[in-house]
Structures are given as structure tokens and as C-alpha cells.
């Protein structure tokens, strides 16, 4: 019984830490949810006919030219293209949905960082602090604010 309560307490601590991390990320980046598309979003997203459905999903994994409508701007990022296509299927070109997806990806990455740090350090408090510092650092804002930077989370 003692071991179970100790495990439950540790799980509760980690869930609270991850919940707090997600809340802080949400509060810090909520103002970006209505940002417009800009810069590379035009050629890799808005003007890219390949992400308007899943009919070319298998080709995302073999043809880097599908990344952009511009000749020679291809990059091998199949999971990014797949996520764009899924976003498009769900909500068309609703910029808020694209930004929410980026925010969720960023929060998931932060959660994974927290788990990794706890595994290495054993300290949930220090791990949470470092994770929040990473998650809200200005250098980490690009993948949340800029849809085309989704792959940099």
C-alpha cells in the first residue's frame, strides 16, 4: 500500500507540473492564435496545392518538391506536410487552427523535455523550471507564431 501511494504521489506531481507547463505556455502564446499567415506560409502552405487533402500523403515521404509551390524550394519534411494536410482537412485555411496546432506541438515537445529531464535529474521542480524556461524563451516563439516553422518545435 505504501508503494502505491508513493507512486500515486509522484504521478500526481508530474501531472500537475505538466499541467502547469501547458497553462504557462497557453498564457504566454495565446495572443498569437489570431496571427495571420506570413512569409514562407505563402509558398509552402497557402499556395501549395499538395496539402489540400491526403491524396498525396504517400508522396510526401518520397518527393521533397511537394513542400512548396515554388520550383527548387523543396525540403524533405513529410510529417510537416502531413500535419498541414490534416489541418486543411479539419478547418481549411483557418489560421487559428494552424496556430493552435503549432501551440499543441510546442506543448507536447515541452512535456517530452520535462519527462527527459526528470528521468536524468530525478527532480520534478528543477525539470519543470528548465522546461518552462525553454518553452517561453523568445527563441522558442518562432515555431508557435510562424506556421511554417512548425518543424522547428
Show which residues each predicted segment covers.
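Polytopic membrane enzymes that build or remodel cell-surface glycoconjugates and lipids
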Residues: 1-153
Amino acid at each position: 500500500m505504501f508503494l502505491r501511494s508513493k507512486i500515486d504521489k509522484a504521478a500526481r506531481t508530474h501531472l500537475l507540473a505538466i499541467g502547469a507547463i501547458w497553462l504557462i505556455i497557453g498564457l504566454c502564446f495565446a495572443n498569437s492564435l489570431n496571427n495571420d499567415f506570413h512569409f514562407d506560409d505563402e509558398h509552402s502552405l497557402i499556395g501549395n496545392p499538395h496539402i489540400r487533402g491526403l491524396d498525396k500523403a504517400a508522396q510526401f515521404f518520397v518527393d521533397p518538391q511537394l513542400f512548396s509551390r515554388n520550383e527548387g524550394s523543396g525540403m524533405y519534411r513529410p510529417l510537416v506536410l502531413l500535419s498541414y494536410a490534416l489541418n486543411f482537412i479539419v478547418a481549411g485555411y483557418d489560421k487559428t487552427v494552424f496556430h493552435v496546432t503549432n501551440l499543441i506541438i510546442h506543448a507536447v515537445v515541452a512535456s517530452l523535455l520535462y519527462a527527459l529531464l526528470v528521468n536524468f535529474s530525478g527532480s520534478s521542480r528543477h525539470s519543470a523550471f528548465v522546461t518552462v524556461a525553454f518553452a517561453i524563451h523568445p527563441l522558442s516563439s518562432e515555431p508557435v507564431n510562424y506556421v511554417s516553422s512548425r518543424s522547428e518545435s
